[in-house]
Amino acid sequence: MTTREYDYIICGAGSAGNVLATRLTEDPNVTVLLLEAGGPDYRFDFRTQMPAALAYPLQGRRYNWAYETDPEPHMDNRRMECGRGKGLGGSSLINGMCYIRGNALDYDNWSTHKGLENWTYLDCLPYFKKAETRDVGPNDYHGGNGPVSVTTSKPGANPLFEAMVDAGVQAGYPRTDDLNGYQQEGFGPMDRTVTPKGRRASTARGYLDQAKGRPNLEIVTHALADRILFDGKRASGVTYLRGSERASAHARREVLVCSGAIASPQLLQRSGVGPGAWLKELDIPIVLDLPGVGQNLQDHLEMYIQYECKEPVSLYPALKWWNQPKIGLEWMLNGTGLGASNHFEAGGFIRTRDDDPWPNIQYHFLPVAINYNGSNAIEMHGFQAHVGSMRSPSRGRVKLRSRDPNAHPSILFNYMAEALDWREFRDAIRATREIMRQPALDRYRGRELNPGADCKSDKELDTFVRARAETAFHPSCSCKMGYDDMAVVDEEGRVHGLEGLRVVDASIMPIITTGNLNAPTIMIAEKIADKIRGRQPLARVDVPYFVANGAMARNVAKAVRQPETV
């Protein structure tokens, strides 16, 4: 078994790991080994590079770990999907490319936790800006020279996007021009991680492309981290597998775990760091009994509220195989056309109750009726809203099943375990129906296909949610930051009770953010990269941001149509 030595070893070349690899190797005197269990991000594979093909990677295992949950007790005991990215780019290689940073109050709320005072929104905003190049240029809220290409909505988009945003406004909710700017709350255009040439802007493209030629960075693909090695309480290296061969590497400074909210706690537990009782079940020598490793697991759950479209303007024809070669050719040659968009070009965030301090419901609008993973396409022109709650009080866990690094862990999100979950999902369905009833959609709106117009009572809505709600693919919080008894890392990602070991990815969020997780994960890695390098944090950006302060969630007086009596 060969052993080589580096300053830093990074386990996982995903949304966070690629940021760290790039930033740390800006110092030519620092050496980094980046380990990735998957393969390269093949630039000629349309499945990962074409934005419109986003469903394809979830349908196989080349780019997807394809985890599955244990039977979810509140979801008809369904085993539910938990897709995570595999390959350079991690989940940024297979996600929906929605660039959503979260609400300012997410971060202000984090900062109220002991030891996390420097995680306010104004502390985080400089790192969002540092990571971003927005196609319309920088401003107080956006960057213009970062590795992540962000594309904004353009003229000529599908008319259903504008109609759905207008319908939300007609229902009495705010309009916002920038879901990542002054005000997240409301309906408006959605930014996307797509390059100016119409390609997916994964962190492999944005970050690793500028770093992979550096002599102080070694990238090893098809390398599955097996265990973190320890010298007493100090992380000293990593053993990993390449096929049937085992290798090890020594870290002079630190081991950085960036394997995501499922695999990071799995790797820690396999290495002897986690709840002592769980480790004893598998006869794993305990390095540190750290009870929070794998606990506090959170996700976003969502539903598809689907309608028939009376006019032939949806993407339904693009689902037919005979139309796809033309779409693919235009995208391949010009980077334009239907293939160059993820087709999540509008959405929004609302509060369903006036006493909600910031939005608790997210919308993605889509001009076709189909599941996120490409299944269950409705055979007609249609459109839908993906809608789900943002900060469920339900908590799950990731638990090691086996010492075999190839074995998937036991995953239980414990979806819909709390009464608030059910209230929010009922509210969301009823609010969506009210939005869809507005005049802006009159020319397009046909029959309600799902849940169906006859599904009205609380009991009927709950039955629909149990049977049909799906993951939004946002697992997080399983190695949370903080200083309480269940915290795993401190405010800089350093694992409590150990030396030379950090976790840097979505697993360290203490509470899930309001929206998609790719942008916040990149920000977290940018912020902690400065800590690792011993650099002063970027100066806070003193800009205003919207706070509801008890304002009405919806201006009923301005609503064009009132809700039907149920």
From Swiss-Prot:
GO terms for molecular function: betaine-aldehyde dehydrogenase (NAD+) activity; choline dehydrogenase activity; flavin adenine dinucleotide binding. It is an enzyme of class 1 (oxidoreductase). GO terms for cellular component: membrane. Keywords: FAD, Flavoprotein, NAD, Oxidoreductase. It catalyses: choline + A = betaine aldehyde + AH2; betaine aldehyde + NAD(+) + H2O = glycine betaine + NADH + 2 H(+). The keyword Flavoprotein applies. InterPro entries: BetA, FAD/NAD-bd_sf, GMC_OxRdtase, GMC_OxRdtase_N, GMC_OxRtase_C. Residues 183-203 are annotated as: Disordered. Pathway: Amine and polyamine biosynthesis; betaine biosynthesis via choline pathway; betaine aldehyde from choline (cytochrome c reductase route): step 1/1. GO terms for biological process: glycine betaine biosynthetic process from choline. The active site is at H474. Gene3D superfamilies: FAD/NAD(P)-binding domain, Glucose Oxidase, domain 3. FAD binds at residues 7-36. Its EC number is 1.1.99.1, 1.2.1.8. Its cofactor is FAD. Involved in the biosynthesis of the osmoprotectant glycine betaine. Catalyzes the oxidation of choline to betaine aldehyde and betaine aldehyde to glycine betaine at the same rate. Belongs to the GMC oxidoreductase family. This is Oxygen-dependent choline dehydrogenase. It comes from Burkholderia ambifaria (strain ATCC BAA-244 / DSM 16087 / CCUG 44356 / LMG 19182 / AMMD). The lineage of its organism: Bacteria, Pseudomonadati, Pseudomonadota, Betaproteobacteria, Burkholderiales.
